[in-house]
Design a protein with these regions (language model features):
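Catalytic Cys-His active-site segments of thiol-dependent hydrolases/isopeptidases
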Residues: 75-77
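Basic, Lys/Arg-enriched alpha-helical interface segments
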Residues: 1-59, 67-72, 81-87
Length: 87
């Protein structure tokens, strides 16, 4: 997914501007230090990288993984707790 597609997804999925601002702020935190803000370790992604979840709001989470060797953060899902965790 390109950056433009990601922006469109966020706008379509989260019509509330305040929530989008929280998502943007949380993504900035992840860029600055992805390990510092990891709240919940979830195992490993399909590439063997450690996966984490970070809370954006009470119900919205960002599911991501980190490739520590290449300093890359992969965003797997942004959504409600139910959508991200499937329950």
């Amino acid at each position: 997914m390109s950056i433009e597609e990601f922006k469109d997804y966020i706008i379509n999925e989260f019509p509330d501007r305040k929530v989008r601002r929280y998502i943007r702020e949380t993504l900035k935190l992840l860029i600055s230090d992805p390990f510092k803000y990891a709240r919940e370790k979830l195992g490993r992604d399909i590439y063997g990288n450690p996966m984490f979840s970070i809370e954006v709001t009470g119900d919205i989470r960002i599911l991501y993984s980190i490739d520590p060797e290449n300093c890359v953060v992969f965003i797997w899902e942004v959504g409600s707790h139910k959508r991200v965790y499937g329950r």
